[in-house]
Regions:
Chain A
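Early extracytoplasmic/lumenal segment of secretory-pathway proteins
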Residues: 26-110, 235
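Mature extracytoplasmic/periplasmic domains
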Residues: 290-354
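Short beta-strand->loop
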Residues: 117-126, 140-141, 169-172, 260, ...
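Ligand-binding pocket segment of bilobal, Venus flytrap-like solute-binding proteins
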Residues: 197-279
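A structural signal for short loop-to-beta-strand junctions that line the ligand-binding cleft
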Residues: 38, 95-100, 118-155, 169, ...
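Secretory targeting signatures
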Residues: 1-31
């Protein structure tokens, strides 16, 4: 028996002898340049797109692209924007997809630092300057955008029970105890965007003795609910949104993080009726842009370029508000008037001003501070 | 090499030994690679990480919650399941096969379907909500309980525990019912003549406790194990809490990436090691109980026993049928919800009947994988799992039986435990092994189209072995001795001495394999992040998780869940046909 155990031990530990040598990630050199990596798989004529569950990519939309260009498309879906970055990092040595769609500006710089994207070959025109503000380099192209901001339930924030906050500090007052829900910046893209906005907000307020994490600590002490994702926060806990009519709804929070146009979307599907509205305090909102980028190590590069061009075409991108519930990145983009979509959508007066580079540099530290503050 | 060494291998063909090594390797390799990978990324050994487990955010809360809910779930399952199994095994029942299939149904229902079924049951408009039991928003009695005790979310806890009991009741039936049905009536008669057999308590103490104890403990151990490692049910029914399993699922995606979120890799390393050790202890306990249990089985003919006790009393009929109705309620709710849509406008809420959810599910209007593709994926993985797991499971079971028959009990015990390892790792750990382990060092596997079948095979193999071992043990060696005197080839000899006797258990194992693979969620949930292999259970989760600004999202998810449920039921019906065939032919 001992002999058998010894053989088994040898059998299973011998192959691991070389495994403890850490695999070094590929990163940009000191000048920020990245080598173009070899293709991670053999070309088979199928464009593989790494994305999350983006509603705009319907069968019909993909079929039209295939009919127009002749390229077949296969989707590799992950949970969210963060999942795309993780997938790209995990498969960096042998990328299996050609095009990443859905990285937002809180993740983009990290992807660039790790040389996960390579330059496209498109001549881009007609994109709005606002969409190009966070990044206008060759490695990623914006395809939709929206402003992340606080949403509240007007039926509860009625001036009597709760009053509309004029400062984020108002939310730490006793009246708001247990009435707020936030998606975690560790696992949620809107949560990450909003936390970044709070950093800028508290750096620019009148009080120099406190920072964003003091506020997060005070929020946690005031019974704020933290969820892993946007869906749990908005659908299960937030009382002002569609969740009220969905199985499993709790409705214990009057305020949450979503988009400034979420009330517009509520009205669009609710026959011009919603009890949700957005709170656009200066610098508490975050201009989120989502990008398409050709993967460094991708195989079907021509097809990937063609898909980006298709994604930015008038026929697809102009319809983003209806098909993807986000704003188009084309010049002169507007929200639809149907069912009060535009009427219930607010525009922030001043978004948080925080660069992609700073986000990439400091995000891990912020997340660590956020965890400490909210524990 | 000693003579003893040779003798230990003599009875087991080399190919079976290779199967044993392959199965153990399949279980050990990914998780070992994952642990070593996490070690390399963090620079911290699993042992050091284990010591720091209490410092990992959420780990201790998750541990306490897992322990508490698993203990309560196990207790309740035993309290409800034991009388159910006793009554079901003791008396004659009409449509016993149908009832047995229905009692077994929850165990093979994909957890994600069960979760959405329970959600529909406890949400406004659901049966429980309508009778004033608000487990979701925790108003009324449940709210009062929360306010009085200071217990956070008792409603979510009750919903989760109820779902676990619903899920695991079939384990009690599976393990305890055959013992009750086959217990030798002479024992009862003899005990009735003794002073200690004159009272109910005395009969429980001197007959039923020693006879049913081991089987009950085995079922309880597995119930505890499945509740402790619960994933999909926790995700949906107790959103404010985490088991260690769901916590690992939440953070596992970022683990094992060099230079990126190292603290997450450390947390995964610590929690995974801790959970694995815990489960290992559970596994050893379960193995010990199961070995004791296997000595009690096959004592008397079941049909004669049932005839002796006659039909059940009205009280027992009500109890068993009542449980059956309760077991079917969440599944019926899933079907109903696929035809209902809630709409809202300034005038208020309305609820209408609709086929739109089914239309969208069929047409794949959403950006997710089309229904037929997801169904094809699910069935492909299930059949690949079956084709690999069944012969492998047979070879391993055959080896274990041979070793036991030749007196190598200890070696058989060790190998048996090693083969059960994937069960101890739980689905998310297996998935993590795939993502952070094999795929990190062998990225070529990314292009392997049946990749999700690999963790499925790992997870179903222990069940196949568990079914095959007793079936092979029951074969009388006299058949082999007699067949060896007849002129027949190797294949013919194998068929007449073994194969023919294993048709039914093999069919049952096949059905279990298919159903288990169809509904598997945890491992696929992680593996699916690194490939385009959405199965039907993942599709249900994807659609159900989508923002529901559009009111037809939920009916669509329910329609998909219904399809998954029906397909799984079809597979299960094959299983019950095999049992029926066995009853008719009594092989």
């Amino acid at each position: 028996m001992r002999c058998f155990c010894f053989v088994m031990l040898l059998l299973f530990t011998a192959p691991l002898s070389g495994c403890l040598e850490t695999l070094e990630p590929i990163t940009a050199d000191e000048e920020g340049q990245c080598a173009v990596l070899d293709a991670g798989r053999t070309s088979d004529g199928v464009l593989r797109i790494l994305t999350y569950d983006i509603a705009a990519f319907s069968d019909e939309m993909i079929s039209t692209f295939t009919n127009q260009t002749g390229y077949d498309v296969e989707m590799i879906r992950v949970d969210d924007s963060g999942g795309i970055l993780e997938q790209l990092l995990q498969t960096q040595q042998a990328q299996q997809a050609d095009l990443a769609i859905g990285l937002d500006n809180t993740y983009l710089q990290t992807a660039l630092n790790f040389c996960l994207l390579q330059p496209h070959e498109l001549n881009l025109t007609g994109l709005s300057e606002t969409a190009l503000e966070p990044y206008d380099g060759p490695n990623a192209v914006p395809f939709d955008r929206g402003d992340v901001c606080l949403n509240y339930d007007e039926s509860r924030v009625d001036g009597t029970n709760l009053t509309e906050p004029t400062s984020l500090w108002n939310l730490t007052e006793p009246a708001w105890e247990g009435q707020t829900v936030f998606p975690s910046p560790v696992t949620s893209s809107p949560g990450r965007a909003f936390m970044s906005a709070t950093v800028d907000y508290f750096e620019n307020d009148e009080d120099n003795t406190t920072d964003a994490f003091d506020w997060w600590k005070a929020m946690a002490e005031n019974g704020a609910i933290f969820t892993s994702g946007w869906t749990e926060a908005y659908e299960i806990h937030y009382s002002g949104g569609y969740g009220a009519w969905v199985e499993g709804h709790l409705g214990d929070a009057a305020l949450t993080v979503s988009y400034c146009h979420s009330p517009g979307v509520e009205a669009f599907y609710g026959e011009n009726w919603t009890q949700s509205t957005s709170l656009t305090l200066e610098r508490s909102t975050f201009h989120q842009v989502e990008y398409a980028g050709i993967i460094n190590g991708g195989t079907e590069l021509e097809a990937a370029n063609a898909f980006i061009a298709y994604l930015l075409s008038e026929e697809v991108n102009r319809n983003m508000p209806e098909n993807n519930l986000m704003q188009s990145v084309l010049d002169n983009a507007t929200w639809p008037e149907t069912n009060g979509y535009a009427y219930h959508t607010d525009s922030p007066s001043l978004n948080a001003e925080i660069t992609n580079e700073r986000i990439a540099e400091e995000m891990e530290g912020w997340i660590s501070d956020w965890k400490t503050a909210t524990q | 090499m000693s003579i003893e060494w040779k003798a230990r291998f003599a009875g087991v063909p080399l190919i079976h030994w290779l199967a044993v090594i392959f199965v153990i390797g399949l279980g050990l390799f990914p998780i070992t690679l994952a642990l070593v990978r996490l070690w390399a990324v963090t620079g911290i050994t699993p042992l050091e990480a284990l010591i720091s487990v209490n410092e990992q955010p959420g780990a201790m809360d998750a541990f306490r919650f897992s322990l508490f809910e698993a203990t309560v779930s196990t207790g309740l399952t035993v309290v409800i399941g034991l009388p159910l199994a006793w009554a079901f095994g003791r008396y004659q029942w009409r449509n016993i096969r149908l009832k047995r299939a229905l009692l077994f149904l929850p165990f093979v229902t994909p957890p994600v379907v069960a979760a959405v079924g329970f959600l529909a049951l406890i949400s406004p408009g659901g049966v429980l909500y309508n009778i004033g039991f608000d487990l979701r928003s925790e108003s009324g009695v449940v709210g009062w309980l929360a306010a009085k005790t200071g217990w956070e979310h008792p409603g979510h806890f009750i919903a989760l525990v109820t779902a676990h009991v619903w899920f695991n009741l079939s384990l009690m039936i599976r393990f305890v019912e055959p013992v009750v049905a086959q217990v030798n009536p002479v024992w009862e008669e003899q005990l009735a003549l003794l002073p200690s057999g004159q009272t109910r308590l005395g009969r429980i103490q001197h007959l039923w406790r020693p006879v049913l104890g081991p089987a009950t403990l085995v079922a309880a151990t597995y119930t505890f194990f499945f509740s402790f490692t619960s994933f999909a049910l926790v995700k949906w029914l107790a959103p404010s809490s985490n088991t260690m399993e769901s916590l690992l699922g939440e953070i596992g995606g970022t683990a094992g990436i060099p230079g990126y979120r190292t603290e997450t890799s450390l947390a995964v390393l610590a929690i995974a090691t801790f959970q694995m050790l815990l489960m290992l202890v559970m596994l050893i306990l379960a193995g010990r109980f199961e070995r004791r249990h296997s000595q009690v089985l096959s004592m008397h003919h079941e049909t004669m026993n049932r005839e002796r006790h006659g039909p059940a009393s009205r009280r027992w009929v009500l109890f068993v049928n009542g449980i059956l109705v309760l077991l079917l309620a969440p599944l019926a709710t899933v079907v109903l919800s696929s035809f209902r849509v809630r709409t809202v406008n300034g005038a208020g809420v309305s609820s209408d009947w609709t086929l739109e959810g089914w239309r969208r599910a069929w047409n794949g209007d959403f950006s997710t994988t089309p229904l037929l593709e997801a169904l094809t994926n699910s069935l492909s993985y299930a059949f690949v799992s079956l084709l690999v797991a069944l012969p492998l499971g047979y070879a391993v079971a055959s080896s274990l039986v041979t070793l036991r028959q030749r007196g190598h009990q200890r070696a058989a015990g060790v190998l048996d435990s090693l083969c059960m390892l994937p069960l101890s790792m739980s689905a998310v750990m297996v998935g993590l092994g795939m993502v952070a382990g094999i795929l990190q060092w062998f990225p070529q596997m990314f292009s392997f189209p049946y990749l999700p079948a690999v963790p499925h095979i790992m997870l179903v193999l222990p069940f196949v072995i568990r079914l095959m071992v007793p079936a092979i043990e029951r074969i009388d060696p006299v058949y082999g001795e007699q067949a060896s005197l007849l002129p027949m080839g190797k294949v013919g000899f194998w068929w007449h001495t073994r194969g023919a006797f294993l048709v039914v258990p093999a069919t049952m194992a096949a059905s279990l394999c298919l159903a288990f693979s169809m509904g598997e969620f945890g491992a696929t949930f992680l593996v699916v992040r690194v490939g385009s292999w959405d199965s039907l259970s993942i599709l249900v989760d994807q659609v159900a998780s989508r923002p529901k600004f559009d009111p037809y999202v939920f009916p669509t998810a329910m329609a998909l869940a219904t399809i998954l449920m029906v397909v799984t039921l079809l597979v299960l019906s094959i299983n019950e046909s095999a049992r029926a065939w066995r009853s008719r032919h009594d092989v």
